[in-house]
């Protein structure tokens, strides 16, 4: 009869590369166990790490996400997808309303968001849109919310008193 002992890791090496990046080596492992452990670790991290994201967007003079903005290269849906890529940190508050206001030709960057001591933008050079007309002014109001895991906009619980009127676009976070 064959022995049913599993290989047990003899070496666990953790090397910190930066404040947000580390490399963990565990060896030896049975064939296929590396993928199993990696997937489990990824799922746990995605579901339990706290973070901040934009959950609601209102763009001046826009009623829904399928609109276009005259003088802006991207359509509203593309701008919303870019907003979802913002890397934001709310160190002290749970929610925060912020405004982005840009007029004139050129890229609309994350750094164009109004300065707020309660908000830290980790990717300030990220391009959200491109204005192609001198007379175009882009005004975007956003709500940043602190949370944990991934939350679909449809599954988010809304207070019955909240005004989810025309023009307020909800984002997954």
Residue ranges and their predicted role:
Residues 1-173:
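Protein-protein interaction/assembly regions in multi-subunit complexes
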């Amino acid at each position: 009869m064959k022995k049913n002992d599993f290989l047990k890791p003899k070496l666990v090496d953790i090397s910190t590369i930066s404040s947000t990046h580390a490399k963990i080596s565990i060896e030896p492992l049975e064939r296929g166990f590396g993928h199993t452990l990696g997937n489990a670790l990824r799922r746990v991290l995605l579901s339990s790490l706290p973070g901040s994201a934009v959950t609601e967007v209102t763009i001046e003079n826009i009623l829904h996400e399928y609109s276009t903005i005259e003088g802006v290269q991207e359509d509203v849906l593309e701008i919303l997808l870019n907003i979802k890529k913002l890397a934001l940190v709310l160190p002290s508050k749970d929610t925060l309303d912020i405004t982005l206001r840009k007029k004139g030709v050129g890229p609309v960057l994350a750094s164009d968001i109004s300065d707020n001591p309660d908000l830290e933008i980790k990717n300030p050079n990220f391009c959200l849109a491109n204005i192609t007309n001198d007379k175009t002014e882009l005004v975007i109001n956003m709500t940043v919310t602190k949370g944990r895991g991934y939350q679909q906009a449809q599954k988010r619980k809304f207070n019955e008193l909240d005004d989810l009127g025309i023009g307020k676009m909800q984002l997954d976070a």
